[in-house]
Structures are given as structure tokens and as C-alpha cells.
Amino acid sequence: MGKHTSEHKNHAQIVQLLQDGQYFFHKGLKAYKERNLKRASKLIQRAVHLEPEDSEMLSQLAVIYSEMGQYQESNDLLDYIMANLEAEMPECHYFKANNFAHLGLFQEAYKEAAAYSDADPDGEFAEENDSLLDLLDLGDDGIEDSLYDQDELLVKQDRAKSLLESGQLAEAVAALEEITTEYPELWSAYNNLALAYFYSGNVVKAKQTAYEVLSHNEGNLHALCNLLVFYYYEREDEKVAELSDQLSNVYPMLLEQRYKLGATLALVGRYEIGYKWLKSLYKTGFEGDDTFFYWLSCSAYFTGHTDFAETIWRKVESQYPGEDRPAPWIERREALPSSVEQRLAAYYISSTKGETEHLEAVIRSKRITAPFETHFVKLLLNGDSAAADVSEDALFAYQTVKLLEQAEKEEMKTEVMSCWVFHVIQQIRAAAPLKNEKGWAAAICYIWKEAHGKQDTKKDTAARFGISPATLTKYMKYIDDILE
């Protein structure tokens, strides 16, 4: 009996130890000293999850983020510490100064270094901070130029965000590419660029951009969440399972990161974890948009919190009247989304059958996350009258398909041809200028008919599309190159 009691007591002590944030914190420090930064960050994230108001743990995590190249995430944590836990923690200013310097934001770096010097002139990092101030002191003209550059960056970021949200995707891509060229370690701009590529239907470049972020900034939560969304919509199920398992063990402190993680996991069907993070935000009074409440309601329903889910959805309907869309759990009972090409083909075939109600429901649905697809469906519904309100990519796809429809009306109604056509269009959008729809359409038509034993002469095909045989040959070569 005594032995059993002793064993039970020891077991309880072990459990208590494992639940103690200090346990994970010291394990994390050990990993940090061994320069295993990835393991250190994960362990200290666990510690912070258990003891979220421990400023020492949070500041150590911020230092690790900085050494991993996650400068913006590090600064976000340091801001959180000073705003919510310890307003008088001078070293936060020094750490922020270094992060800003790495990001190329030298005026902000100078301000933070000066703040550290004022708050703790003889502090632990005084010597290093003085060296940083000397390095950053470019004189009045230099500081003025730096300030102008940073103001210009903020304007550029705001403009790019506005373009992205309004569906002006070609312009958003151009703006974000310019920002990433000028600020090669501003990972938030890369993440937005990846989304802009994805929304445009350029999934290849979207993935490449996310991979680029992660190659330099391993553990970047926004990049990982973006990548999970890309895998999900491309039906790469094994990668979805692997990455969602990885993200299920992440413990974000910041509200924005909780929102991103919760909504992403809910999207891919990891409702339990998604609900945990979204509900934690709701409890804090987080002022989310309709998308936040959509995924909160959805994840609540599929984790058995049906009354709460229905309450939240009624709130969405009252705050956003006129949307006329089904509750998320009704939409989510439908089959998982197919590839982009299959979805585009399905929309097109629906339009040839006059299924306008179905296409209008698609527009209202949250199932589409890419403005490119929404714009394409709008064109199918409204024709060229919608051209002024859609992206260049969507208009190119629509006009190319309509040219093919005029030439091969019955064939285009078949799923086999339409899926192949949209596959080629997707590759064109990823790798070629969106010009001369007649040239592209003629080449697509000729290659398709040749592959199916229905070959016309190049002269006849070119004449049907109003181009020269030489132009047809040129665009056939383009397609051969991009499909290799």
C-alpha cells in the first residue's frame, strides 16, 4: 500500500513537472545554447503557452526569432511585452533596434537604440547599443532621407494591400515585387506576394514564394499557413496532413497569428485546433470581420458546439445583411474543392448549360478564396460588360475560352477538353504575357485536335482565328515550352 502511494505521488510529481512552463523554458535554453534554434523556439513556445505572462520567456523567444531571421515576429513579441506586461523593459528597445536594422528600417532602428540609451545608459547592452548608434548616425541629411524612405515604404505597403483586397491582382503583384526587391528581408511583403500570385491562379509562383520565405525564415507562421492553403486547394492531401500536424503544435501569442492559424486549420478541416484559437480570440473581445466569424461558426459546429455556431452565424447575418449565403456547415458538407483547372472547367460548363443560379451561388460562397476565380465567374454571368471590374488574368482566360467556344463549341462542353484548356491557360498565366488571345486560342485548338486525330492544316486553323500561320506556329512553340 505504501509503495503504491509512493509511486502514485512520484507519478503526480512527474506530471506536475511536465506541466510546468519552467521545464520547457530550461529545455529551450539548453537547445538555444546548443544552437538548435528550431527546437529552442518550439520548446519556449510551449513554455509561453503554459505561462503566457512571463516576460523573460517571451523576450528570450523574441531573441531566438531574431536569430532565426524572423525580425518582424520578434518585434511583434517585444511590442506585446512592453504594451501588456512590462512597460519598463529597456532591453526590448535594443532588441527592436537590431531587428529594424536587419530589415533596413534604419530610422526606426535609430529611434529604438536611442530609447534604450535614454532608459538604461549603463545597461547590459550599452556598449553594443552605442556601436549601433554610431553605425546608424548618418547625420541630419541621412536621417531625413531614411525617414523619407520609410514613409515611402509604408505608402507602398498600404497601396499593395489595397490592390490585393480589391482584386487588382496584376497591379498588386507588381507593387509587391517592387517592395521585395527593395527590402529583401521584409517577409510580410513576400507573404502578401505569395497570396497575390495564388489569387491570380499562379499557384506555382505562389508556392515558390512561400518556399523562398521559409528557406530564409524557417518557421514563418504566415508562410506556413499560406503553403497549407495552397496544398489544400491543389488537393495535395499528404502534404496537407503533414503540414497541418506541424501547425497543430504551434502556440502563437499574438492575436493576428492566432487568427491566421485558427482560420487556416479550420479551412483544411482541423476543426478542434482551429476552434481553440478562434474561440480564444472571441473571448478576448477580438473585433473580427465576417471571415473571422465564418470560420469561428464553422469550427464550432463541427466540434459539437452547435448552439454557439448558430448564434455566431445569426450575428454574421445581422451584421452583414444581403449576403444571402448558406451557413458554413452546409457548404462544408460538400466535396472538397478540386484543382483550379477542374473548378474553372466546372464553372464554364455550368455557364454553357445556363446554370446561372449555380454560378451566382458560387459568387456568394466562401468556398472561393481567389479573386481570379470570382472574376472569371462574374464574366461568365455578365459577359464583357463586367470587363472593367475584373483582373487582367480573368479577362484573358474568359476571352481565350470564348474564342475556343466559337471554334469548337461542342468539344468545349466536354470535361476532358475544357479541363485541358484551363490547364494550359493556367500555365500561360504563370509563365507568359497575357496578350493576343487569338494566338493562344488558335495554338490550343490546333494542339488539341492534333492530339486527338482531328488535325486541320495550320493555314485553316489560323484563318479560323484570324491570324497568320506564322503566328500560330509561334504560339504553338510557346505552349510546347511552358508544358515541358
Swiss-Prot record:
The keyword Methyltransferase does not apply. TPR repeats lie at residues 21-54, 55-88, 187-220. Pfam families: TPR_16. Keywords: Repeat, TPR repeat. It comes from the Bacteria. InterPro entries: TPR-like_helical_dom_sf, TPR_rpt. Transmembrane segments: none annotated. This is TPR repeat-containing protein YvcD. It comes from Bacillus subtilis (strain 168).
